[in-house]
Regions:
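Binding-interface segments
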Residues: 16-255
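Glycine- and charge-rich intrinsically disordered segments
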Residues: 1-32, 260-317
Length: 317
């Protein structure tokens, strides 16, 4: 995957007012680049996915077009969809204060990890799930033996039950098995340690935050909601699943070249060749809020007429 240097040079500055992603994608050099990388038959779907992603995350409109394009091309190269409804990968806005611009980072979702693992053909079974209160009987970290009594007779009650931990497991086609269990406290501590955008305890900095427990209880000023825009606040389970898979596969699982590239680029601003340039802190990220019950096809079917016309103009004019 490569972005023409001409595209980088034309976008190596703050996005100007009105310089929309549609305008950028309509350039002859960009259209040629798209056709060369994804093929003419896939161009419409690719452009549609970018436009839809930008509409779902308005803050992306303030990002450099090349950073959006590069992240989207990387996802395309991995054969993953940027649709927030599918949760395979996201393009997340990041404010680069040193450069004075906003850039889009490539963020792999846990469903993207699963897709890449399945496609490798080396995983016979792969699963990750939340363990609810009352379900865990025991877990031996040495033997990795676990005993759970899942509430399979009442999934509605299970959905509402308190999460006490997370379990991930894989079995390879050659019979090798590996499993992990983390308590909810382990996961919260992990997020607190590695995510600058998440705080387990209350903070008193320039922008004070309430503790995570108070956030869950709704004990925070709603005008400060932007302080809690990290996925660790908006979708803790999703981030926990991703963390479990990344820990499990990264340490013990075989990884294809595609998965290695995805691991390396995760949470990074990527360059024109899909390689990570920087791993920004995500305090400024505005995460998309979507209806996860929707499908990618539904999103495309419900596109506004002017959006579809923009796409037609981009590809065929």
């Amino acid at each position: 995957m490569a972005v023409n240097n001409q595209l980088v040079n034309q976008d190596n500055k703050k996005p100007s007012v009105g310089a929309t992603i549609a305008t950028f994608l309509s350039g002859e050099a960009v259209k040629k680049n798209i056709a060369d990388v994804v093929g003419k038959t896939n161009s419409t779907r690719f452009v549609t996915s970018i436009v839809s992603a930008v509409q779902n995350t308005p803050a992306l409109k303030e990002c450099t077009n090349v950073s959006i394009f590069s992240a989207a091309l990387l996802g395309q190269g991995l054969e993953l969809s940027p649709s927030p409804q599918l949760g395979q990968f996201y393009m997340v806005p990041f404010e680069d204060k040193k450069a004075g611009i906003k850039q889009a980072t490539f963020v792999l979702g846990y469903k993207g990890y699963i897709q890449l693992a399945i496609r490798s053909g080396q995983y016979k079974r792969l699963n990750v799930m939340a363990i609810k209160e009352g379900e865990l009987q025991y877990f031996d970290p040495l033997s990795e033996e676990i005993s759970v009594n899942l509430m399979v007779d009442n999934w509605d009650a299970r959905e509402k039950a308190k999460t006490i931990g997370y379990y991930a497991f894989f079995e390879l086609t050659n019979g090798f098995k590996k499993a992990m269990y983390w308590s909810i406290d382990q996961m919260i501590n992990h997020a607190d340690k590695y995510s600058p955008a998440f705080s387990k305890n209350a903070t008193n900095g320039k922008y004070p935050k309430v503790s995570y427990a108070d956030y869950l209880a709704g004990n925070y000023d709603k005008k400060d909601a932007w302080l809690y825009s990290s996925f660790w606040y908006k979708d803790f389970d999703g981030m926990a699943y991703k963390t479990m898979l990344r820990q499990l596969i990264g340490k013990w699982g075989p990884m294809s070249i595609s998965m290695q590239n995805a691991f390396a680029a995760d949470n990074a601003v990527v360059d024109q060749n899909g390689f990570p340039v920087t791993y920004p802190e995500q305090e400024e990220a505005e995460m998309p809020t979507v209806d996860t019950t929707a499908t990618e096809e539904t999103v495309q079917e419900q596109q506004a007429p002017d959006q579809q016309q923009d796409i037609n103009d981009i590809l065929f004019n």
